[in-house]
Amino acid sequence: MKVEEHVPLIQESRKRKCQSSENASKRQQLLSKLPLRLHTGNENVDLSPLVSAIRKAKRIVVVTGAGISCDAGIPDFRSSEGLFSSLRAEYKLNCSGKELFDGSVYRDLKSVNIFHAMIRKLHMLSNNARPTDFHLFLSQLAQESKLLRLYTQNIDFLETRLEGLQTCIPLPQSAPWPTTIPLHGTLEVVSCTRCSFLKKFNPDIFDRNGVTVCPDCKTENEVRRIAGKRSVIEGCLRPRIVLYNEIHPDSESIGSVCSQDLKSRPDCLIVAGTSCKIPGVKRIIKEMSNCVHKQKGNVIWLNYDEPTKDFLNLCDLVVQGDLQIAIRRLKPLLDAPSWKLKSHSAKRTSKQKSSEQTKITSSTKITKAIGLNTKSNDSSKKDNTSFQLHQVLNSIEIPKVEIKQEVEYATPSPL
């Protein structure tokens, strides 16, 4: 064979070696992008990467779903044994259980009664449940000033019972914001479909056929009747949770909180117990992940299921399996003090007892409705319909039925 014939073979061999080297480099880059996977089913699993990520973090953001409360006896929504499936079987529904959580549920009396029965049951389960190890872990992070924010999709109010995880309803429009941001509302509170009325949840409100009329709306109509004015449509009471195809009453506040948290440069994101199906939650996770990676921090996924393709490339650490088991094993490694449940019952003063509108529990506050500004104690009284009624009654001469004083009405802001 001539020398000229050897040259193409040598060149082809070199080309193949270069391609092989490039492919190996690409494979290495791909592997470096894949998250580290830990399975709680393996008793010998090394949790040191998870411990290291949490220890070095100073500003942790946590996004949670129903999976963190299953161990407390509260069902999730989408699993085969979840709330949607059980509702369909219990009430023999032709529709999916998800449709009971749609904003159109109040258009049909039968759907309303089923929805209210489900709400009473869910509130009872939540009220009797105890926070899980993961809830206590979140409280510990807050007490150690490592938790920047907790965004929860849960309505069971287990988080807000614990120290450091307080929230308020409605959310304020400007800082300071509470540690816990309920993305879907809470079963601790009922609200009016028309006015700004808020009250602590009472199961008796939903233990009847149909709906319960808002007391503030009834009082307002009584004032208007005495003043010789036309009556207005009265709202009804409902749990202050966000249903599918509804506008979130605190959407602007949540957007402001997210913007502020991104500016605070979080260095760790923990996504726990959620499949991330809600578009708004997806956006929060993606934006927070990008911000965390800019700070050279870690994005941690804790769930039975592995992350979807949308989130797989965002995660640095995937802990797949029972997240309660993971936290129990993590606890001694972090050298955390004993995590004790703070007493949910607190002594109330006579002033607090006289006003359920001021405070629901030791951890969840009811604040003034969004958009109402009060300049003084006198002006805040004038916004109260009961005070207006008192004014009107005092302005009536007996026996002459004559109104001497024109009554002004503060238009309540819709939720």
Swiss-Prot record:
Record's catalysed reaction(s): N(6)-acetyl-L-lysyl-[protein] + NAD(+) + H2O = 2''-O-acetyl-ADP-D-ribose + nicotinamide + L-lysyl-[protein]
Residues annotated as the enzyme's active site: H184
Positions annotated to bind NAD(+): 65-84, 153-156, 273-275, 303-305, 323
GO terms for MF: histone deacetylase activity, NAD-dependent; histone H3K14 deacetylase activity, NAD-dependent; histone H3K56 deacetylase activity, NAD-dependent; metal ion binding; NAD+ binding
Residue span, Deacetylase sirtuin-type domain: 40-337
Cofactor(s) recorded in Swiss-Prot or TrEMBL: Zn(2+)
Cellular localization per UniProt: Nucleus, Nucleolus
Residues annotated to bind Zn(2+): C192, C195, C214, C217
Enzyme Commission no: 2.3.1.286
Keyword Membrane on entry: no
GO terms under biological process: DNA repair-dependent chromatin remodeling; negative regulation of transcription by RNA polymerase II; pericentric heterochromatin formation; rDNA heterochromatin formation; replication-born double-strand break repair via sister chromatid exchange; subtelomeric heterochromatin formation
PANTHER family: NAD-DEPENDENT HISTONE DEACETYLASE HST4 (PTHR11085:SF15), NAD-DEPENDENT PROTEIN DEACYLASE SIRTUIN-5, MITOCHONDRIAL-RELATED (PTHR11085)
Similarity section: Belongs to the sirtuin family. Class I subfamily.
Protein name (record): NAD-dependent protein deacetylase hst4
Species assigned in the record: Schizosaccharomyces pombe (strain 972 / ATCC 24843) (Fission yeast)
Gene name, Swiss-Prot/TrEMBL: hst4
